C-alpha cells in the first residue's frame, strides 16, 4: 500500500475505562484541628524515638533500629542522626569476621542504600559450596534483600539471589513469624519498594512483631495519618485544577487518571516538604497522558506531524491550522506549562527551570510522533533504533524537569548534567520503558491490528511473545544494576536529585511489574494502592 495513504488514516480508537474515583477527591473536607493534634503528637513522639535511636548501645542494634525506621516511613524525621550513625558504622568497618549472615547482609544493604562503597566480598565466608549459603531463616531473608542492591559482575550476589529466592519460596507455605515478610519480599524486594506504600503495609506487620515498641508504632500510625490528610488536601487542589479543563468531555479518547498520576507524585517523594514535587509530577503526567493518547489513540500521521511542528515553534499563532481537538490539546499543554513557569519563577525562584521543561515537552512530542509514523506506516525500525527513541518516551526527562522547582539543591549545573544523558538516568528510563512495553502490548496492538515494539523484537529475533517478555525482564534486571551503581557513584549530584531516578524505577516496578498490567491505564490495577494511601486511614 502507498505509505502516503496511511498518513491520513486514524488509528483504531481504544475506549478506556472511566475514572473510578469520580468526585471522591474534589469533595474532601479536612479537619484542621485534627491535623494540628496529629502534628503535636508526632513532635512529642519524635523526641522519644530520637532518644531511643541515640541510646541504641551497639552497631547491630543501631542498624536494626534504622532499618525499622525506614520500613515504617519515619527515617526522614531523623535523617541527620541516621547518616551520622551509618557513617560511623562504615568508618569502623563494623562486621568484620564476627558478624552473622543477617547482620552482614543488613549492614551491606543499608550502606549501599545510603551511597557508601562496600564490597560484596563480605559474603564469601557464608558460601559453603557452589551457589549455596549458610545461615538461618532471618539471615537468608536479609541476604535476599541485600542481593538486590547489586552491581554488574557481582557473581556472588547473583548466586545469593537465586539461592535465597528458591529457599524462601518454600517458606511461604509454612506457618512462620517471617511468612508475611517473605511473601512481600518475593513479590517485590525491599530496595525496589515505593517507600510510603511499603510503610503502609509494614505498619500492620510491625504491630504483630514480638519486639514491637509502642512508641515507635504509635509514631508510625500518627505520621501516616498526618501524611494522608496532607495528600488529601493536595489531591483536592489538583482535582479542582484538573476539572476546570473538562478534558474528559472535550477529548473522550484520553485516559482520565488524576489519582493515578498523583500516586506517581507520592512515589517520587512522600515527605511533607516535597509538596511541589508531587504537583510537578502530576502536571507532567497530565501533559504526557494527553500527548500519548493523542498520538497513540487518535491522531493521523499528518495531523501529528503538523502538531509536532507547531509545538516545536512554541507559538499559539498557528493554532488555527490544527483540527479542533488538537487546538484543545495545545491549549492545555500551554496552560500547564504557564502554571509551571509561574511556580518556578515566582514561587521557587528557579527561572532557569522553565526552558528545560519546555524542551522536554517538545522532545517527548517528537518521540511520540516518531513512534506513530513507525506504527501507522508499518515500518518498525531495528530494535536498537526503537530503544534509542524509548529513552525519550520513557518520560524520564520530562518528569525529572517537572520537579525541579520543588528541589532546593537543584541548580543549572544539574540540568547540564541530565542533558548529557548519564547512564544512570538512561537505564532508569529503560526500566520504565521495558515494563510499559510489556504492560501495554495488548492495548497498543489494538487486537493485533497495529505493530508494537514487542512485535518488532519478535520479528527481528524470531522469538515468541513469552520469550520476548522474558528478554525484556532480563533487560530490566540489568538496568537495575546500572541504577544501583549510579545511585552509589554519582556523588557530583546531591542525594535529593539522584534519588529521583531510584524512585522513578521503583514506581515503574510497582506500576507495571505485576501480571503484565498497566497501572495507569487500568484503574483497577492501582485501586488498592490509592485506597490505602489516600482513602483509608490507619486505626489508632
Curated annotation (Swiss-Prot):
One of its GO terms (biological process) is diterpenoid biosynthetic process. Mg(2+) 3 binds at residues 436, 440, 444. It catalyses: (2E,6E)-farnesyl diphosphate = (+)-gamma-cadinene + diphosphate. SUPFAM superfamilies: Terpenoid cyclases/Protein prenyltransferases, Terpenoid synthases. Binds 3 Mg(2+) or Mn(2+) ions per subunit. Sesquiterpene synthase that catalyzes the cyclization of trans,trans-farnesyl diphosphate (FPP) to gamma cadinene. This is Gamma-cadinene synthase. It comes from Ocimum basilicum.
Amino acid at each position: 500500500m502507498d505509505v502516503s495513504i496511511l498518513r491520513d488514516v486514524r488509528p483504531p480508537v481504544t475506549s478506556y475505562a472511566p475514572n473510578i474515583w469520580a468526585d471522591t477527591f474534589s469533595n474532601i473536607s479536612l479537619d484542621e484541628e485534627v491535623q494540628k493534634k496529629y502534628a503535636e503528637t508526632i513532635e512529642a513522639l519524635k523526641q522519644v524515638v530520637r532518644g531511643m535511636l541515640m541510646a541504641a548501645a551497639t552497631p547491630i542494634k543501631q542498624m536494626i533500629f534504622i532499618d525499622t525506621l525506614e520500613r515504617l516511613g519515619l527515617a526522614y524525621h531523623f535523617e541527620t542522626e541516621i547518616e551520622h550513625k551509618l557513617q560511623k558504622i562504615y568508618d569502623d568497618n563494623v562486621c568484620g569476621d564476627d558478624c552473622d549472615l543477617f547482620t552482614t547482609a543488613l549492614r551491606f544493604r543499608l550502606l549501599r542504600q545510603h551511597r557508601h562503597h562496600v564490597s560484596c566480598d563480605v559474603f564469601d565466608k557464608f558460601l559453603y559450596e557452589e551457589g549455596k549459603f549458610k545461615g538461618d531463616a532471618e539471615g537468608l531473608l536479609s541476604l535476599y534483600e541485600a542481593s538486590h542492591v547489586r552491581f554488574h559482575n557481582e557473581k556472588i550476589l547473583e548466586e545469593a539471589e537465586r539461592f535465597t529466592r528458591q529457599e524462601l519460596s518454600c517458606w511461604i507455605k509454612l506457618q512462620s513469624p517471617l511468612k508475611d515478610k517473605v511473601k512481600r519480599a518475593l513479590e517485590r524486594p525491599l530496595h525496589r519498594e515505593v517507600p510510603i506504600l511499603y510503610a503502609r503495609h509494614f505498619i500492620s506487620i510491625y504491630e504483630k512483631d514480638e519486639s514491637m515498641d509502642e512508641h515507635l508504632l504509635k509514631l508510625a500510625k500518627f505520621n501516616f495519618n498526618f501524611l494522608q490528610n496532607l495528600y488529601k488536601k493536595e489531591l483536592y487542589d489538583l482535582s479542582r485544577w484538573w476539572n476546570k479543563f473538562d478534558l474528559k468531555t472535550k477529548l473522550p479518547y484520553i485516559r482520565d487518571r488524576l489519582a493515578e498520576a498523583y500516586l506517581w507524585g507520592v512515589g517520587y517523594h512522600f515527605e511533607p516538604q516535597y509538596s511541589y514535587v508531587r504537583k510537578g509530577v502530576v502536571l507532567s503526567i497530565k501533559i504526557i497522558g494527553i500527548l500519548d493518547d493523542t498520538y497513540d489513540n487518535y491522531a493521523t500521521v499528518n495531523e501529528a506531524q503538523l502538531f509536532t511542528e507547531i509545538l516545536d515553534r512554541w507559538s499559539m499563532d498557528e493554532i488555527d491550522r490544527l483540527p479542533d481537538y488538537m487546538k484543545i490539546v495545545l491549549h492545555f499543554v500551554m496552560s500547564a506549562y504557564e502554571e509551571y513557569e509561574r511556580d518556578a519563577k515566582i514561587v521557587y525562584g528557579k527561572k532557569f527551570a522553565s526552558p528545560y521543561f519546555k524542551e522536554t515537552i517538545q522532545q517527548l512530542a517528537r518521540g511520540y510522533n516518531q513512534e506513530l509514523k513507525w506504527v501507522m506506516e508499518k515500518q518498525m525500525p531495528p530494535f536498537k533504533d526503537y530503544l534509542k527513541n524509548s529513552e525519550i518516551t520513557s518520560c524520564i526527562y520530562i518528569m525529572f524537569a517537572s520537579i525541579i522547582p520543588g528541589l532546593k539543591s537543584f541548580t543549572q549545573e544539574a540540568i547540564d548534567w541530565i542533558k548529557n544523558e548519564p547512564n544512570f538516568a538512561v537505564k532508569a528510563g529503560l526500566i520504565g520503558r521495558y515494563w510499559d512495553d510489556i504492560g501495554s502490548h495488548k492495548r497498543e496492538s489494538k487486537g493485533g491490528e497495529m505493530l508494537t515494539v514487542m512485535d518488532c523484537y519478535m520479528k527481528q529475533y524470531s522469538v515468541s511473545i513469552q520469550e520476548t517478555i522474558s528478554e525484556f525482564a532480563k533487560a530490566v534486571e540489568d538496568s537495575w544494576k546500572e541504577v544501583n551503581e549510579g545511585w552509589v557513584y554519582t556523588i557530583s549530584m546531591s542525594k535529593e536529585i539522584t534519588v529521583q531516578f531510584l524512585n522513578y524505577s521503583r514506581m515503574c516496578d510497582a506500576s507495571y511489574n505485576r501480571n503484565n498490567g498497566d497501572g495507569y491505564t487500568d484503574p483497577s490495577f492501582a485501586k488498592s494502592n490509592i485506597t490505602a494511601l489516600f482513602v483509608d486511614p490507619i486505626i489508632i
